[in-house]
A protein has these predicted regions:
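N-terminal loops that bind phosphate or other acidic moieties
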Residues: 1-265
């Protein structure tokens, strides 16, 4: 017997939550432990829970002590971990704590070798939390642009086109920095179509958007940009890695949970 509508709705809700739980979903997508180092990075509201799940699985094979790295989550969403550091930062408008943590993440993957593994854990909110302004602009300048984009009615794809080209870590730049190490991204999707290039602004995948796209969005919504941001969006060196870039050849993405899977639960 199903019971009252309230009980049915609660069961449906619990089923969807269980499907989305990193503790249950992540284990089936983990890559083998590497011969070299294992660096854990990531960002999102579920980043701490995902880090816990990785530690539990690595602990089962007796290699959890080899894990290192950090993930960024929203204030109030931190959980206790043993080897992977969890840093809290602001969402949806980035703050200095997020920038500092993102800089540490980028530094942690720089200089790795081909036997090393970067495991990137992404979930909803990752784009705002993984903020590292590209050279030439400040956090305050990026905040102004972010606020204007959030208030003008731009779509998530349009916002991300701007974010990527103003970032030192998004739009494939994280994976490019990690090369020649292998980069495996485990992502919980919260976007329509489950496009890895949109989830957290795609720090480990080729960016299909261009500088021209970013500037079109600015013009479309009549966004007034700080002079430094105008300069960044006008220089060719601000372009993000594209499909076929050799620096992305060892990067892959695995969607561990999608909205459709939660709905069907």
């Amino acid at each position: 017997m199903i019971g009252t509508p309230e009980i049915l709705l609660r069961k449906m809700f619990d089923s969807a939550v269980n499907v989305a739980s990193p503790k249950l979903s992540l284990r089936h997508h983990l890559p083998p432990s590497p011969m070299g180092r294992t660096i854990i990075v990531g960002a999102g509201k579920a980043a701490a829970a995902m880090a816990q799940a990785v530690e539990a699985e690595w602990d089962d094979i007796g290699r959890a002590g080899e894990l290192e790295g950090l993930v960024i989550t929203r204030y109030g969403h931190s959980l206790e971990t043993r080897w992977i550091e969890v840093v809290e930062a602001a969402h949806p408008v980035p703050d200095a704590a997020g920038v500092s943590a993102a800089a540490r993440i980028l530094e942690s993957v720089t200089g790795l070798g081909p036997d090393d593994l970067v495991l990137c854990l992404l979930s909803g909110g990752g784009s705002a939390l993984l903020t590292l302004p590209i050279e030439g602009i400040s956090l305050d300048e990026k905040r102004v642009v972010t606020r204007d984009l959030l208030n003008c009615g731009a779509t998530i794809s349009e916002i991300n086109a701007i974010r990527k080209h103003l970032s030192a870590i998004k739009g494939g730049r994280l994976a490019a920095a990690a090369f020649p190490a292998q980069t495996v991204t485990l992502a919980i999707s919260d976007v329509p179509g489950d496009d890895p290039a949109i989830i957290a602004s795609g720090p480990t995948v080729a960016d299909p958007s261009t500088l021209a796209d970013a500037n079109y969005v600015i013009e479309k919504y009549q966004i007034e940009l700080p002079p430094a941001v105008q300069m960044v969006l006008g220089r060719k060196s601000s372009e993000t890695p594209k499909a076929g870039d050799p620096l992305l050849q060892r990067a892959s993405v695995r969607l561990i949970v999608t909205p459709q899977e939660a709905l069907e639960a």
